[in-house]
């Protein structure tokens, strides 16, 4: 299990959407149990892969690169071909995927903290990912005037929420499916607008959905 932290939940107990996950650090910090300085130091040492030189040549990381990132590279090429605005947003998606990789590397070199995941230390390590997710979402908001690509931007903005699986336990797979459904709403609009007009846009939708499906398969396997 490589999930890094518990997700926030909605009032009905269901998994929170990514906009909520992007703020998980604040919620986790507010609700975190008080730890002694010794306990905090122990938990930090178990998670501290970002400031130490650790090997990323482990099966779970290689699988991420070979399975998920290879699909992302194909998506990135197709997205850049659509235009500079889309290219800029998909690069932000890539940065978010890199932050997930960093967490996977950290998790592969430590055991789950005995004090649990709902601590300020874990929230600290989730912060870069939360920032990356927020960047993708804010990019869409900053480009609402993009008539041609607004549905594309929204597809990525909604789908990026799926990376919040690292903050979901015990079953992150279904969470990815829920976020894919949110992205599908806008993806269907892209298909409706461009089917029979410009198939490259339709193919782009398929590529992004393939990324989400591949990531879910990775999570369910590892």
Predicted segments with their positions:
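Non-transmembrane, amphipathic alpha-helical segments
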Residues: 49-60, 81-92, 117, 121-124, ...
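Generic surface-pattern signal
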Residues: 73, 77-80, 98, 105, ...
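Generic N-terminal leader/targeting and pre-domain segments
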Residues: 1-131
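Extended, domain-scale alpha-helical bundle/helix-rich regions
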Residues: 165-222
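Short, charged/polar, low-complexity loop and linker segments
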Residues: 134-139, 157-168
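Generic recognition of well-structured, leucine-rich alpha-helical segments
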Residues: 2-5, 107, 136, 170, ...
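Short amphipathic alpha-helical coiled-coil/interface segments
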Residues: 97-100, 126-133, 160, 180, ...
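Mid-membrane cores of alpha-helical transmembrane segments in multi-pass membrane proteins
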Residues: 155-157, 182
């Amino acid at each position: 299990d490589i999930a890094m932290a518990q997700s926030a939940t909605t009032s009905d107990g269901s998994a929170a959407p990514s906009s909520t996950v992007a703020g998980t650090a604040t919620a986790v910090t507010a609700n975190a149990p008080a730890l002694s300085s010794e306990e905090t130091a122990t938990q930090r040492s178990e998670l501290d892969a970002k400031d130490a030189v650790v090997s990323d040549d482990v099966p779970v990381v290689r699988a991420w690169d070979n399975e998920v990132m290879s699909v992302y590279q194909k998506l990135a090429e197709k997205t850049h071909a659509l235009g500079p605005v889309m290219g800029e947003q998909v690069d932000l998606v890539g940065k978010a995927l890199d932050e997930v990789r960093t967490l996977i590397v950290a998790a592969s070199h430590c055991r789950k903290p005995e004090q649990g995941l709902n601590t300020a230390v874990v929230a600290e390590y989730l912060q870069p990912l939360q920032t990356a997710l927020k960047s993708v979402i804010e990019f869409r908001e900053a480009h609402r005037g993009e008539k041609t690509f607004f549905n594309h931007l929204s597809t990525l903005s909604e789908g990026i929420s799926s990376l919040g699986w690292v903050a979901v336990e015990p079953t992150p797979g279904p969470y990815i499916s829920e976020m894919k459904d949110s992205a599908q709403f806008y993806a269907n609009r892209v298909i409706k607008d461009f089917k029979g007009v410009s198939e490259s846009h339709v193919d782009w939708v398929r590529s992004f959905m393939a990324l989400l499906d591949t990531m879910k398969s990775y999570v369910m396997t590892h």
